[in-house]
Amino acid sequence: NVFIVTARINGKTSDKNGIGIFEIDAKNCDIRSYNTIDGYRCSEVAFNYVNGKLLCSDEKAYECILETIYAGALAVSSEAIGIMQKCFDLTIDYLKTRTQFGKTIGSFQALQHRMVDLMIEIEQAKSSVMLAAGTYSSEKHIKYKNISAAKNLVGRVGKLVAEECIQLHGGIGMTWEY
């Protein structure tokens, strides 16, 4: 197993040149794994006096880093769309089954309007991600602009969807059981 890491090998902090991408053997690193509060696992990796194989440097390394960052931003934005859609679907199901005053709460017009507003926001974010994915093979400035716009919109809409879905679920929306 190996790690691919970046490091400054010379030059100033803001300089595109002087960056190197290295392959580091994982056996030479100190790895500490631990559980997080939400039940997931994380690891902390320490690179103490390790030797690495230089894969590329300077302008080439900078371009590789940019490409990786933008590919990751597009992937995370795509994943977030799926998460938003799942939250929306769970909330729709909840509104169809939860009763209050002898009626399902999904029949209340105010809640229907809120869900329609969420659907519009999710569809807009989804379209933005699809545009970014569709222009991935375009010139870099077009690709980077579209991915940045999608990531920005998805971040704002994701926060809105999470807040609204929790609100619409009421107290049960804050529990691990649900």
Each model region followed by its residue ranges:
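Short, glycine- and charge-enriched coil/turn segments that flank and shape catalytic ligand pockets
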Residues: N10-G18, K53-K60, S137-K143
